[in-house]
UniProtKB/Swiss-Prot annotation:
GO terms for cellular component: cytoplasm. This is Ribonuclease M5 1. The gene is rnmV1. InterPro entries: RNase_M5, RNase_M5_C, TOPRIM_dom, TOPRIM_RNase_M5-like. The keyword Repressor does not apply. GO terms for molecular function: metal ion binding; ribonuclease M5 activity; rRNA binding.
Length: 191
């Protein structure tokens, strides 16, 4: 695929490192900003805020603890950024190593960027904690597995029960979207 055929991304994509940048640029035509790890400096946060104001920002970090830490730091400093998520499967290395955007295929990256979520920091929850409990997402023998599969289906990343509630609220996932996802997940169990 040549440069002219690649999907163009207006926003700046925030990634963790230079290998992530290389992989992103294999998949799409986009500018990136590298955090260089989870110890994000105030200067980097200021840059992200400036870029958010001028072009918009997409946070695209690894689906691991450090990636989630970076995502949280950026979200708190610059509310309203967009988010792209890879599944752990899509970010897994072909050999030994840790999960990372740098291991994702160009197709997986494009798919993640096609399903962005924009934060609604002050949004009212559309789904209650009770709804999540009734759906078996916060307790029970399959809760963890259901959350993992829900995160993959909705492309919002893996969460624990508490994080799931916050993420569904933050991204304003509707009850209908949750219902559709759960039907899909539970139908998978029948195969």
């Amino acid at each position: 695929m040549n440069e002219n055929d690649k999907m163009k991304i207006k926003e700046v994509i925030v990634v963790e490192g230079k290998d992530d940048t290389k992989r992103i640029q294999m998949a799409v035509n986009a500018d990136t900003l590298e955090t260089r790890g989870s110890a994000i400096s105030d200067e980097t946060l200021d840059q992200i805020e400036d870029l958010y104001d001028k072009r918009g920002v997409i946070v695209f970090t690894d689906p691991d603890f450090s990636g989630e830490k970076i995502r949280k730091i950026i979200t708190e400093a610059v509310p309203g950024v967009k988010h792209a998520f890879l599944t752990k499967h899509d970010a897994a290395p072909s050999h030994k190593g840790s999960l990372g955007v740098e291991h994702a295929s160009p197709e997986a990256i494009r798919e993640a960027l096609a399903h962005l979520y924009t934060e609604v920091p002050d949004g009212e929850p559309l789904i209650s904690r009770e709804d999540l409990a009734v759906a078996g997402l916060t307790s029970g023998p399959q809760a963890k597995e259901y959350r993992r599969r829900l995160g993959e289906y909705l492309r919002i990343g893996y969460t624990n029960g508490k994080q799931l509630y916050k993420r569904l609220k933050l991204f304003q996932i509707t009850p209908d979207e949750l219902k559709k996802a759960l039907e899909y997940i539970k139908n998978e169990d029948n195969y």
